[in-house]
A protein has these predicted regions:
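Long, charge-rich intrinsically disordered scaffolds of nucleic-acid metabolism proteins
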Residues: 98, 403, 409, 414-484, ...
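Accessory alpha-helical DNA-binding modules that contact the DNA backbone or grooves
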Residues: 32-33, 44, 48-115, 120-146, ...
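Long, charged amphipathic helices and adjacent flexible linkers at domain junctions
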Residues: 285-303, 454-487, 595-640
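Duplex nucleic acid-engaging cores and interfaces of nucleic-acid transaction enzymes
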Residues: 51-54, 61, 65-322, 328-414, ...
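A glycine-rich phosphate-binding loop feature that marks nucleotide/adenosyl-phosphate handling sites
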Residues: 179-186, 323-327, 381-386, 405-412, ...
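Low-complexity, acidic/Ser/Thr- and charged residue-rich accessory regions of DNA metabolism proteins
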Residues: 143-144, 148-152, 208-209, 246-256, ...
Length: 711
């Protein structure tokens, strides 16, 4: 990668050039973000996953920019306009807008007024006016009157059209205006279409104005969505006269002030250039740039929410009875073994209109006893509270815990190809209930099968740049899977596909080998898997676990490339490697500095020692049960001042949504989080966090609930 890009990335991320250079080199060698951040700390100077991912993002951006530069240079060269100075300007670009501004005058374009004027032979007149090379434009214009130009006025008008287009394509003019526009206010007005119920959700923006520099991402995205739907007209409030004067002043500073007759013509050309060409173009540019920033923030929030969702506490390998609640169609019940395999399914009808409560109680009691059920998972959708109350009437064995589980995305999963492949003989209701039960056992292993956009934890996710969103979500899923580690002998191909260096094809091959040859007994056995070579092994091995392996390091995050270091540590302590692994007292006696070498630095040695103390540790917390307020069943039961327990279901830039046990979630606005001013919700709350809230408003007409966070 060129040094200008290396330096640009380093400046953007506030890191050293060599850190960027080494990261890029590792990427080019096939290394992944999790592998680099975990096992190559010496090469990166200890950059964390976020920083490494940012380097990857920007290296990809600049790789695309380099391709664009080649296209631009070829196009300008073919037009016979490429000079050495122009080539240097293009080569030195590190901003795509700057590159496009430079290319604009040479870009193929549709027929314009300026094109017609040039065809009429008026470009020499425009050149003389533009270069302030004449005093009397009228006298000069007379020379151009003829077959193609009917009058002096037509000649001057054509020359002004050429000048206006030239100004609109001048990079310095565009950048000057861009900086002015960025400091102004974005203003909206309701359109004639904004009369129906669909438009009312944008009512607060029907006559709205806010500084473009300060507008919150969610407000900008809402405004732009309303504009796309035809309910708002959007513009940037700028003073056209001042903008025209500014670019005219800059123009004259570079040349000289024209005499009065020419000045009048130039003012007309500048005014036309601004109003007809520059203002709409620069407005679009600046709003697009503001949206890009809003996209980045929204995608960041989505990624953070997804991380918290994927790393939600698991109950682990327990026998689960899962219920997908319903009224008319009944509650679908499934029983799962410790590995999540389906043992039994049937429907019960404890709620109206059937109301077979006694029979349903007997069924649940029988299933709990027959299958040795340890935990019960209840979906949080329709009839969830009623089903939870019903389960409390069942006399369960001591120790059986009851959990409410988010159903977000379960219906998407149940109708997916993945679900059909897993359960071809069962319908969507059974698949949905199985998904609810498995999410309780291991949220990460189950949720990787579902498109993250279906999980209900985003902010205007359908409005943001989809490629940016996909990149962030893929990185987040990969990060979570690799931070937890994956059991090589139980993981599905969907989970394995997110392990560093594997992907869908190798994941299928790993599962196929396991099916044909039985459980893996060592990490080295991976090298027998079809198409899994040395590079893939290097990237994935440290993130895969083999419980009960002959070598205990195979069930840890210690990479096979470092096994010899652990063996030496054990030998120096006079014990075996098996005796060392997991023995905190022995690990505390290791002198880390003794094992530092040219290839392995102190950061890696410290990581190894920490892993030896708690091999294969799961970074996730333990699952805990939770109960909503029993007296609240609908929004009509709420009143201002009530204090209620709740669970955070979504976090946005403007607040957090909380499930308080009824159909509608409440909103803790950023101003209601117990801190002075507007809080950053993502720094105060976590997804699925259990909270105490006070009701501050209830709007029955719009079914909206306002909440305040209590300490």
């Amino acid at each position: 990668m060129k040094s200008i890009y290396i330096k640009s990335i380093a400046q953007r991320l506030q890191i050293k050039d060599w850190q960027v250079e080494n990261c890029v080199s590792l990427f080019e060698d096939g290394a992944t973000i999790p592998f680099i951040s975990r096992y190559r700390k010496e090469r990166t100077g200890g950059l964390d996953e976020v920083a490494v991912a940012e380097v990857k993002h920007w290296s990809d951006v600049f790789a695309e920019m380099e391709k664009r530069k080649v296209t631009v240079l070829e196009a300008i060269d073919q037009a016979g306009a490429l000079t050495e100075e122009l080539r240097k300007r293009i080569d030195s670009c590190v901003e795509i807008r700057e590159l496009e501004d430079i290319y604009l005058p040479y870009k193929p374009k549709r027929r314009t007024r300026a094109t017609a004027a040039k065809e009429a032979g008026l470009e020499p007149l425009a050149d003389k006016m533009y270069n302030v090379a004449i005093v009397d434009p009228v006298a000069e214009a007379r020379k151009f009157v003829g077959d193609k130009v009917a009058s002096v006025d037509d000649a001057l008008a054509g020359a002004r059209d050429i000048i206006a287009e030239r100004l609109s394509e001048t990079a310095s003019v565009r950048e000057t205006l861009r900086q002015i526009f960025k400091t102004r206010r974005i203003a909206t007005k309701a359109t004639k279409k904004a009369t129906g119920q669909e438009a009312m959700k944008y009512k607060s923006y029907f006559d709205y104005s806010e500084s473009l520099e300060r507008i919150a991402p969610h407000r900008l995205l809402a405004i732009l969505r309303a504009e796309d739907e035809g309910f708002l007209s959007v513009k940037i409030d700028v003073d056209a006269e001042k903008c025209g004067k500014k670019i005219y002043y800059d123009f004259c500073q570079e040349r000289r002030y024209p005499a009065a007759p020419l000045a009048e013509q130039m003012h007309m050309a500048f005014d036309d250039a601004f109003k007809r060409l520059l203002e709409p173009s620069i407005s679009n540019d600046v709003i697009k740039e503001a949206k890009e920033k809003a996209d980045i923030e929204s995608v960041r929030i989505f990624g953070e929410n997804l991380r918290q969702l994927l790393l939600a506490p698991p109950v682990g390998q327990k026998r689960v009875l899962a219920i997908d609640p319903g009224f008319r169609t009944g509650c679908k019940v499934v029983c799962l073994d410790e590995q999540g395999n389906l043992l039994h399914n049937e429907a019960i009808f404890p709620h109206p209109p059937v109301s077979e409560k006694v029979k349903a109680i007997q069924t649940i009691s029988s299933l709990v006893s027959k299958y040795g059920i340890e935990v019960i998972a209840i979906g949080n959708g329709t009839a969830s509270r009623e089903t939870e109350d019903f389960i409390k009437r069942v006399q369960l064995p001591e120790g059986v815990r009851v959990f409410t589980v988010s159903e977000d995305g379960a219906s998407i999963y149940s109708a997916s190809d993945v679900a059909r492949e897993e359960f071809p003989e069962y319908d969507v209701t059974v698949r949905g209930a199985v998904s609810i039960g498995r999410r309780l056992m291991d949220p990460l292993a189950e949720l990787v099968k579902i498109d993250p956009k279906s999980l209900g934890v985003g902010q205007y996710q359908h409005d943001v740049d989809l490629s940016l969103l996909k990149e962030k979500l893929d990185n987040t899923v990969e990060s979570c899977v690799n931070s937890v580690g994956v059991n090589l002998n139980t993981a599905s191909s969907y989970l394995l596909s997110y392990v560093s260096g594997i992907g869908p094809a190798l994941a299928d091959n790993i599962v196929e080998y396991r099916s044909e040859n039985g459980a893996y007994t060592s990490r080295k056995e991976l090298l027998k898997v079809k198409r899994l070579g040395g590079k893939a092994f290097e990237q994935c091995a440290g993130f895969l676990r083999i419980a009960g392996a002959d070598n205990p390091l195979d069930n840890s995050a210690v990479h096979p490339e470092s096994y010899h270091i652990v063996d030496k540590m054990a030998k120096d302590l006079g014990v075996t490697t098996k005796e060392l692994v997991g023995n905190v007292d022995l690990c505390s006696k290791i002198e880390a500095s003794r094992y530092v070498s040219g290839d392995v630095g102190l950061p890696t040695i410290n990581d190894i020692i920490n892993e030896l103390k708690k091999p294969g540790r799961d970074p996730r917390e333990s699952a805990e049960t939770f109960e909503f307020c029993h007296d609240i069943k609908t929004i009509e039961d709420l009143s201002v001042g009530m204090e209620l327990p709740g669970i955070v279901t979504n976090i946005t830039a403007f607040g957090a949504f909380v499930d308080i046990g009824i159909k509608q979630n409440g909103l803790i606005h950023a101003s209601q989080m117990g801190v002075k001013g507007m809080a950053d919700p993502s720094k105060i709350l976590k997804l699925h966090q259990k909270v105490k809230v006070t009701v501050v408003s209830v709007d029955l007409d719009r079914a909206r609930i306002g909440l305040r966070l209590e300490k």
